[in-house]
């Protein structure tokens, strides 16, 4: 089975590693590297991992105009984890199955920054959801959920680490 993986932050790295151990990851798509200081760029965590694993890496500003390039990999499955961009339906339709690993217990905290919003709202529990992707954001069939306790000392980074394992 050939997979295209889309992700950007540390949260997504263990997911990419696990997929790479069991399947053929044809392409990794991550957000473009951003400037840390003037003229200096740092790889996104997923980009750094993809490079270290010797995987094909693509970092477009947006993916919507890269349909033909993505299609050329002839992958069966798309897996996303904190990619940071909406994936157009035209691209979703290239795959037999599209899965998203989302950093909340859906349907709560759909969309971006779910971990940060859980902390801001004083939640004691959050989690991760594996779901089917549809054209509506974070609204597909949910296949699995795992809870995670939020302690008073937890930062967003701590929770990212707990959820990405």
Language model: regions and residue ranges:
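Catalytic cores of RNA-modifying enzymes
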Residues: 1, 48-53, 71, 77
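N-terminal Rossmann-like dinucleotide-binding module
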Residues: 1-39
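Short beta->alpha connector loops
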Residues: 8-11, 61-64, 83-85
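Short, structured coil segments at secondary-structure junctions
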Residues: 21-22, 53, 94-95
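Hydrophobic beta-strand scaffold residues
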Residues: 25, 56-57, 98, 126
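N-terminal beta-loop-helix "entrance" segment that forms/cooperates
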Residues: 34-53
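Short amphipathic alpha-helix with an adjacent loop that forms part of the alpha/beta core around
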Residues: 64-74
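Donor/substrate-binding cores of folate-linked one-carbon enzymes
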Residues: 77-165
């Amino acid at each position: 089975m050939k997979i295209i993986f889309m992700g950007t932050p540390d949260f997504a790295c263990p997911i990419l590693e696990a997929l790479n151990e069991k399947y053929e990851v044809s392409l990794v798509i991550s957000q473009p590297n951003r400037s840390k200081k003037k003229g200096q760029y740092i790889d996104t965590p997923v980009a750094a991992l993809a490079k270290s694993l010797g995987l094909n890496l693509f970092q477009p500003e947006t993916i919507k105009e890269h349909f033909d390039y993505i299609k050329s990999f002839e992958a069966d499955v798309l897996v996303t984890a904190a990619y940071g961009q909406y994936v157009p339906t035209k691209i979703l339709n290239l795959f037999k199955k599209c899965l998203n690993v989302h950093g909340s217990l859906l349907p709560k905290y759909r969309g971006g920054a779910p971990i940060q919003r859980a902390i801001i709202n004083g939640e004691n529990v959050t989690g991760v959801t594996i779901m089917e992707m549809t054209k509506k954001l974070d609204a597909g069939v949910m296949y699995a959920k795992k809870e995670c306790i939020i302690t008073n000392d937890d930062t967003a980074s701590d929770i990212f680490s707990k959820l990405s394992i």
